[in-house]
Amino acid sequence: MPSDIMEQRGVSTPSHFHEDIHITSERQFGFMKTDMMPENQGGRDRLSSMPKSSWTSESYQLKPQSSFSGSHPSGSPNARNTTNGSQWESSLFSSSMSDLFSRKLRLQGSDMLSTMSANTVVTHREEEPSESLEEIEAQTIGNLLPDEDDLFAEVTGEVGRKSRANTGDELDEFDLFSSVGGMELDGDIFSSVSHRNGERGGNNSVGELNRGEIPSRTLLVGNISSNVEDYELKVLFEQFGDIQALHTACKNRGFIMVSYCDIRAAQNAARALQNKLLRGTKLDIRYSISKENPSQKDTSKGALLVNNLDSSISNQELNRLVKSYGEVKEIRRTMHDNSQIYIEFFDVRAAAAALGGLNGLEVAGKKLQLVPTYPEGTRYTSQCAANDTEGCLPKTSYSNTSSGHIGRHFPGMISSTSSDGGSMRVIHNSIGSPVNSFIERHRSLSIPIGFPPSANGISASKPVGLQEHGHHFDNSNMGIQSMPNLHPHSFSEYVDNFANGSPYTSSAFSEMVSDGSKANEGFMIHNVRGVEGFSGGGIGSPMHQSSRRPINLWSNSNTQQQNPSSGMMWPNSPSHINSIPTQRPPVTVFSRAPPIMVNMASSPVHHHIGSAPVLNSPFWDRRQAYVAESLESSGFHIGSHGSMGIPGSSPSHPMDIGSHKTFSVGGNRMDVNSQNAVLRSPQQLSHLFPGRSPMGSMPGSFDSPNERYRNLSHRRSESSSSNADKKLYELDVDRILRGEDRRTTLMIKNIPNKYTSKMLLSAIDEHCKGTYDFLYLPIDFKNKCNVGYAFINLIEPEKIVPFFKAFNGKKWEKFNSEKVATLTYARIQGKTALIAHFQNSSLMNEDKRCRPILFHTDGPNAGDQEPFPMGSNIRSRPGKPRSSSIDNYNSFSISSVSENREETPNGTDPFLKEN
């Protein structure tokens, strides 16, 4: 019996101990699996059946003074509970306190000894109420969680050793949160963690290349905007060396692969472009290697193994033999076979040439046998190569996010990601601080080490947790104890769980995160697709659960609304951001995420039932008052967002949100995703708030969605402009003459608005007749004038030089215009791409004078116009039949420019002009 155990330890058993042992069945973060022990039952039989791995001495404990404990060290039943003075911030729970203290709190002690045997249980003590409700609430909020430094210092110090014991991996460090998503920490946390664990160096700032990362010819480039053209990326990366391959199939998912021929070019590109701005986002570059694939060319590996070489041939002699094919990076005898020579070239083309020239060559009476191989240090072990389908290596995929995000896994491990039907391997740092991997800016969908073959049926492009019912992970088949799911709750529900004896001990937490498979299996990632795509249970909901409910931000549907007029403030847990008080109910957010919060979802914001959005803590520390400080100037409009408190309405009817991409973290502020900023109409809101006047209690300053989109787009374009981005479109004659820039499509700016296509052609033909095959002068149909710019495609890059000298920086002759022509590159390059862009455009319904013009470049008709090919799926202008477009143009009754047309009257072309 538990009382016998307590007597053996010399601790008196409280009189109420036998009646008040409660172990809740509701799963909490850090709790043991619920089916291990039924509710309201405890004792030797059930505890002894638990796996011994859950009770090892390695389970690291948090400090007693930082725990939420109701026991006194003396063990006296009359001893008062001590109060921890640590300052704590948490956004796990909403601030509803309606039924917080409806009964006495029975709090469980959390300072369980690490050497406690499997049949030992912890005692519950009854908390005596304080003098006032305010004092109880304030003290409880402040003491909910342990101190941040203590948590990370102690947990991370033990997790590495526990992981090696459980998995057999000989990792120098273990990433505490790597298997369950990225997390950012401030620099002082790095220092404290490294200092406490006695480790030096390796603390890389966010975004820098990891020291110890193995260089390779292939770079995985993250934070790539989907609207960046392929030729822009090619120009950007080609300046460092010849590119072997550019994989952009996953560009819409936020990353690309760039393979260089020379490994030195890849290193130079990684160093030069790391953290450089491209379309307003910082590039994140990692080295990666190609997975061994039979379909790949064997000559692209960059290294050779030389067999059947006479032992009298020294390495120096062999070096002289092979260096004629290219520079040799390394040449040596292999460790496992002294007769085998390993040769690595800087350039894969040199390796291919050496393979073709030396294989079968007779040297000292023996024919050389050369076998292509991957550079050592980047190949997979034979065990992983054989068992790769069984989850030997963690796998990474990218979800559909606008900015694109890259997952991080265990330091020193290699993860794979899909690209062009094949897969790539990402090499991560094997040295450095114990938490340097989970502080990256990326989120990932990962399958941890140790998953059985049944997990292979899960599509890599599909978020874990949204799989079909027939392909979900079965914990019983894995032979592991699953990590209980995370259910964010209001504070009242959280305390109720404590009252029922829910164990949130440091040992359970450290035991849980010590095994990567446990830590990741308990989280089910939901890629939220509006209201219908969200599982009612929030993050961690069972995959078989099919219930749906609307997404509520900052509120819990099971709790009552906090009185907005209350002046209650929490001394240890701030409930406002940037001095925005809680009396402003329409916007209520928390100032930072809790230290132990795990970012699992891949979307820019994670919607949790009953909790504030989980955002990286350094973002909140930037103290940018973008929330509720100035609703109109900041672009943060209540009408576009869900779960905002509305006076006179209950939280059970929150304002619905239009999409899961409500917020996005961009730079150092919180932006509203412009593509999903939807203003609910009064009719729509009336369905959400039956019996109420939904707009009566709302702020009156609502602008239209189009105006809001323009404001947000203008602010985003200003913040994203950079010199590096502009250089992509600058025309450099010297690079053209050297053959380094092969683009042919130009944008002619500052054209007088009275110029027609015929006048422009006449001016061009005076200097460069027959050198171009495409011309397009966009027309504003309102005033029948051009919009100030045109696009021309030269037949060869060399033809740009005389065209540039004839027009760039020159004034136009007609109309006494003061405009000075300037030339830049266009976004869309090449005649083929231009035709594909316009052939299905609504321009094909307009008068021929408004369409792009093509020209013959060969034969006797060179220089003459040719018909523009019509597409099979031509778009029509909204509200206007196709047949009436030409008549309307001729009668000067053209309506305003439609949203589908590529030209705009303000002088900017969203498809062809640079951003």
Curated annotation (Swiss-Prot):
Tissues/organs with expression: Expressed in roots, shoots, leaves, flowers and siliques.
The protein's role, per its UniProt record: Probable RNA-binding transcriptional activator that plays a role in meiosis and vegetative growth. May be a downstream effector of TOR signaling pathway and recruited by RAPTOR1 for TOR substrate.
Span list, region Disordered: 1-90, 690-723, 854-915
Gene coding for it: ML1
Species assigned in the record: Arabidopsis thaliana (Mouse-ear cress)
Organism placement in taxonomy: Eukaryota, Viridiplantae, Streptophyta, Embryophyta, Tracheophyta
Gene disruption: observed consequences: Early flowering.
Protein name: Protein MEI2-like 1
Pfam families: RRM_1 (PF00076), RRM_2 (PF04059)
RRM domain span: 217-290, 302-375
